[in-house]
């Protein structure tokens, strides 16, 4: 029996569009909740030991409820859930997400966001087929990358309550911004020398403490470097591969950028052995990652 591949591809795009529409709905709801939510802490910790904010849990519950309604979703994996949550045995896609990245900054009114990775059938780097993130700031913004090899698409919420396409995002070969994370006293000498070189070349420091907003700024401004290295207290980095790192690696590489853990040619080469695994990570234009490899001894 011959399979109609056009029908299969059409069904996949239909399912993905349903997922993206759900992400749009989620973004609008979380954006409203943030305005008036209780910003206190719960008595619980997530799988990586972070004490959960009530807003983290509320955002996670919103996303879970929305995606449970989709027959194409096989399972959900969240930064705020210890285990994978099965949804539909006949579903095809696993959604891995950070419900509210930078949530501890809401009390000082910084921009925060949600990150989504869409995996086909299995949670493997090569199975990540689409990614998206939303930004909750002065404006509600959304970036969707629906296919490998295509540029990420940037949207902004309009007065009519609908997201309006603004433009495709593309990184220049060399940028001007340097968003460097982790506590400096824990940096290696190699990393310190690398960052100092960027400043010596005239890069401007732009770091808020929310991964999603810092990476968003670099994308919109055309280039630069975001780094969260291995440190003495977090030798495997602190950012989570499935929920945060790989979705942004997908978007950055499709925007013409490059990613690395300091050793690899791409973050997609990192071997994942557990759901909440973390990794050092570097996202940037080609020039910044080439300089990274020079300092880290890859070349």
UniProtKB/Swiss-Prot annotation:
Binding site for substrate: 101-104, 207, 238
InterPro entries assigned to the protein according to its UniProt record, in alphabetical order: FBPase_C_dom, FBPase_class-1, FBPase_N, FBPtase, SBPase
Pathway of action: Carbohydrate biosynthesis; gluconeogenesis
Broad EC category: hydrolase
Subcellular location: Cytoplasm
GO BP term (any one): gluconeogenesis
Listed GO MF terms: fructose 1,6-bisphosphate 1-phosphatase activity; magnesium ion binding
Binding site for Mg(2+) 2: 98, 101, 244
Cofactor field: Mg(2+)
Presence of the UniProt keyword Magnesium in the record: yes
Entry EC no(s): 3.1.3.11
GO cellular component: cytosol
The reaction(s) this protein catalyses: beta-D-fructose 1,6-bisphosphate + H2O = beta-D-fructose 6-phosphate + phosphate
Residues binding Mg(2+) 1: 79, 98, 100
Cofactor note as given: Binds 2 magnesium ions per subunit.
A Pfam family that the UniProt record links to this protein: FBPase_C
The keyword Ion transport is assigned to this record: no
Keywords: Carbohydrate metabolism, Cytoplasm, Hydrolase, Magnesium, Metal-binding
Family: Belongs to the FBPase class 1 family.
Quaternary context: Homotetramer.
Protein name, per record: Fructose-1,6-bisphosphatase class 1
């Amino acid at each position: 029996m011959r399979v109609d591949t056009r029908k299969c591809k059409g069904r996949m795009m239909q399912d993905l569009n349903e997922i993206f529409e759900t992400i749009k709905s989620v973004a609008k709801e979380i954006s409203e909740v943030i305005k008036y939510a209780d910003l206190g802490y719960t008595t619980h910790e997530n799988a990586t030991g972070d004490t959960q904010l009530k807003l983290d849990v509320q955002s996670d519950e919103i996303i879970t409820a929305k995606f449970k309604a989709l027959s194409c979703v096989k399972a959900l994996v969240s930064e705020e859930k210890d285990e994978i949550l099965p949804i539909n045995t006949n579903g095809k896609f696993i959604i891995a997400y950070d419900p509210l990245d930078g949530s501890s900054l809401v009390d000082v009114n910084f921009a925060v966001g949600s990150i989504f990775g869409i995996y086909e059938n299995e949670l493997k780097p090569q199975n990540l087929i689409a990614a998206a993130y939303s930004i909750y700031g002065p404006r509600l913004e959304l970036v969707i990358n629906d296919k490998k090899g295509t540029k990420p698409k940037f949207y902004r919420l309009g007065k009519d309550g609908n997201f309006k396409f603004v433009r495709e995002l593309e990184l220049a070969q060399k940028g001007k911004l340097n968003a460097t994370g982790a506590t400096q006293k824990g940096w290696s000498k190699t990393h310190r020398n690398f960052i100092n070189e960027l400043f010596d070349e005239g890069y401007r420091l732009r770091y808020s403490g929310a991964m999603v907003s810092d990476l968003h700024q670099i994308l919109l401004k055309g280039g630069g470097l975001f780094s969260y290295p291995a440190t003495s207290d977090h030798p495997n980095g602190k950012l989570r591969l499935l929920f945060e790192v790989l979705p942004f690696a997908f978007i950055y590489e499709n925007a013409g950028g490059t990613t690395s853990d300091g050793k690899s040619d791409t973050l997609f080469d990192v071997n994942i052995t557990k759901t909440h695994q973390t990794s050092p990570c570097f996202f940037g234009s080609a020039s910044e990652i080439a300089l990274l490899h020079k300092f880290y001894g890859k070349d």
